[in-house]
């Protein structure tokens, strides 16, 4: 299996940079400062028009956790359909119950929608807050998910590398395991060699100053080093 890095992109510009760097697949988001939200349709359309990247689109209506109100769920399904109609090659999503277990009803419904377009269904790092990784991954396999993005239920994937290895050894022939969080050029090879996975997910981010940001008007809550930066 050919090894690859999926680039986590926060904008059209990020996708172009990834493409110029020979990336083959991106996960397109907005608002990476809060972990990634649903991107604009226009950014997807422009990326598909100008590149041959495989584009997985995040569908996440808000920041924070992954247990949603009914209205938010319906909005995410509408977003997913619109993105798929406009060329998305897959959708990254995650639905949990209040107890942290996978919401099987909404997850199955989303997988079926994505597969009706013959595209990839990717369960994102909501997986990492489930109480039982093995029960969760078996649920995803039973529901038909194609891939799961995971840091091995730790803050960073290298911290969860042993669980990632076990998951790949036990389930890698049934679902793709995609390690993500803290992955970079220095540790990607070690992750692949140790766990047996053939792909990793990395944001490869850099920061760009925006002269219009100020310290007297706050638009969001950012970590200190991002206060004057655009992601």
PLM features per residue range, with description:
Residues 3-7, 26-28, 55-59, 91-93, ...:
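Hydrophobic faces of well-ordered beta-strands that scaffold small-molecule active sites
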Residues 7-12, 58-66, 74, 125-132, ...:
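Glycine-rich beta-to-alpha transition loops that act as phosphate-gripper elements at the mouths
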Residues 14, 68-73, 132-142, 183-196:
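Catalytic cores of alpha/beta
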Residues 22-26, 51-52, 87-89, 141-147, ...:
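Glycine-enriched alpha-helix->loop->beta-strand junction motifs that scaffold or abut catalytic
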Residues 27-34, 93-97, 147-157, 198-214:
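Glycine-rich phosphate-binding active-site loops on the catalytic face of alpha/beta enzymes
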Residues 34-50, 98-113, 130-135, 155-168, ...:
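Active-site-adjacent beta->alpha loops and helix N-cap segments on the catalytic face
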Residues 55-102:
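Glycine/small-residue-rich loop that forms an oxyanion/phosphate-binding "nest" at active or ligand-binding sites
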Residues 220-227:
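Conserved small/polar residues in nucleotide/adenosyl-binding loops
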């Amino acid at each position: 299996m050919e090894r690859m890095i999926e680039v986590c992109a926060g904008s059209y510009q990020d996708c172009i940079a990834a493409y110029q760097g020979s990336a083959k697949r991106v996960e397109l988001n907005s608002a990476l400062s809060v972990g990634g939200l649903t991107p604009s349709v226009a950014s997807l359309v422009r990326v598909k028009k100008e590149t041959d990247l495989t584009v997985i689109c995040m569908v996440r209506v808000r920041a924070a956790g992954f247990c949603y109100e009914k209205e938010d769920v319906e909005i995410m399904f509408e977003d997913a359909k619109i993105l798929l109609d406009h060329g998305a090659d897959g959708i990254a999503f995650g639905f949990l119950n209040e107890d942290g277990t996978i919401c099987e009803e909404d997850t199955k419904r989303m997988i079926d929608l994505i597969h009706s377009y013959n595209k990839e269904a990717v369960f994102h790092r909501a997986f990492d807050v489930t109480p039982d990784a093995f029960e969760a991954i078996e649920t995803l396999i039973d529901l038909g998910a194609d891939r799961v993005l995971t840091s091995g239920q730790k803050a960073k994937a290298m911290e969860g590398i042993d669980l990632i290895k076990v998951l790949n050894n036990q389930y890698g022939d049934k679902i793709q395991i995609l390690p993500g969080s803290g992955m970079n050029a220095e540790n990607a090879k070690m992750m692949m060699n140790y766990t047996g996975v053939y792909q990793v997910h990395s944001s490869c981010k850099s920061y760009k100053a925006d002269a219009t940001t100020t310290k007297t008007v706050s638009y969001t809550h950012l970590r200190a080093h991002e206060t004057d930066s655009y992601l």
